[in-house]
Each structure stands twice: as C-alpha cells, then as structure tokens.
C-alpha cells in the first residue's frame, strides 16, 4: 500500500512540475527564462498582409523568426530570446523597413512587456490586454504558453521560417508584393 501512495505522490509531483519546466527546453534555458536573462517567448506583431512577406523582411534584417500569417496581420515568433535579442530585432526590422511600425511583445520571467517600435526606436509601452484585443487569438496563447508553433501549423496557419529564405528569395518575395512586382516594368530581380 505504501508503494502505491509513494507512486501516486511522485506522479502528482511530476505532473505539477510538467507545467513549470518544459523538458524540451532543458534546465539551463528554463532557469535563464525564470531569472529574466532569456525571454520565454517574443513576438513581433505587424499589419503586413502575409507571413511570407514578413519572413522576407526578417531575412533582410538578419532576424531569425517563424512568421505566421493572419487576417489581422502577420506575426514573427523570434528565435533569439537571449538578453536584449527581442528588442534588437524590433529595432533592426523597423530600421530596415523604414516607416513600418511593429509591436514587440515579450514574456520574460513571466512578466509580459509590450511596446511599439518605429524607425528603430522603442515608443509607447502599453498593457498586454490592449494588444490581445486587437490581434489574433493565437498571439495571447503563444505569449502565455497555451499553444506552440507546431500546434498552429497543424491547425492550418501559414508559417514561413525566415531562415529558409536566402537574400535573393527574400528580394523576389518583395518584388511579388509590390505594384511593380506584379508584372510591371522592373518586376524582375536579377
């Protein structure tokens, strides 16, 4: 009888810890996330029409991200979560794509931070609920760890990895999304 009780207690502890520590991340990564040295998740939210276009912009800005398409705007799930990597990505993207405003949402040590970036500068910060009311539902779910990128893929969301594009492919995507790229003069990129 004692073994059954011990076994059930151990199972209960393991089940409770599964919510706290994701074994796929490893102990060091999980500890860095809890201490705030590494973000648990960071998203760049845009008003761009497609995941492919956002992935092209990320590739040209040297940002490693998985970009998800949505009606309200494409979202980049950043891969560099160390230190100020997410903030640097938002600065780089809005510097390379002049005039584009993005929203950076970061979950660091279970604290959600949301700020707008324009022209390479951090602007207004605001409460996460404000972001969640104007973005696809999966943004909140990703930020809180309720859903994973793989789950979104299986649900049919368009996901494009910026690392899967080279410079020429990114430039061709830009050409395809511009007025001139739809068959007008100068639509080819050599």
Walk through the language-model features, giving the residues of each.
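Long, compositionally biased intrinsically disordered terminal regions
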Residues: 119-124, 129-190
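Acidic, serine/threonine-rich intrinsically disordered low-complexity regions
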Residues: 1-29
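Hydrophobic alpha-helical segments that drive targeting, anchoring, or assembly
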Residues: 25-149
